[in-house]
Amino acid sequence: MPGALEEHAEVVAAAEQWLTKAAGGVTPDYLAPAIIARYGKDRTFSVPILTHCALAGKGRWKDVIQLPFELAALPRNWFAALRLPVVSYALPALIAIGQCRHQHRPSWNPFTRVLRNAAREKTLQVLEQIQPSNGGFLEATPLTSFVTMSLAGCGLPDHPVARKGIEFLHASVRDDGSWPIDTHLATWVTTLSVNALGEDLPDDARAPIREWLLKQQYRE
């Protein structure tokens, strides 16, 4: 934002100081390895964060791991075998972020490059099909934002998925200008509690919880 650095110079300086202490510096040479190391093999957040940095001009596309979005063009009954569950963080981010990275730094392999170019339209159709009617993927602001910014970043700001994502973000912003991580955490908190209790969960409580969880499932 124009003037933001000057207006919030103290906050920016404090953030840079913290990052320098945690990662060793604030250049891509320091931040990219630190982000990847922080999340390990889980690319759910490291790849979107690095994509955001690259789109903002604070990172390098070579540091963004290419997600194989072309896999989303395969038949849906293959998704489980490929560990691509439809209702998860995996698929929307795979498609949008994968396409964005491919747009800015395509593979050196001509076969892979042609394959991904051919899969772009099909996988965008899949992304449109799995987007809920309110535009929010899993009712989650981070995921919806990652998808929306990636589509805009690869030249598709007016794509229906991007437009619905923006509508969701506008509709879910709080009065103070912030967003909740998710608009409804009850399902997540309930499943975490059930997993924590394990065999100690009373038998008479299991059926009501199971029925409630089933009612939360999207059926679009």
In which residue ranges do the predicted regions lie?
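Preference for long, amphipathic alpha-helical scaffolds in soluble/luminal domains
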Residues: 1-220
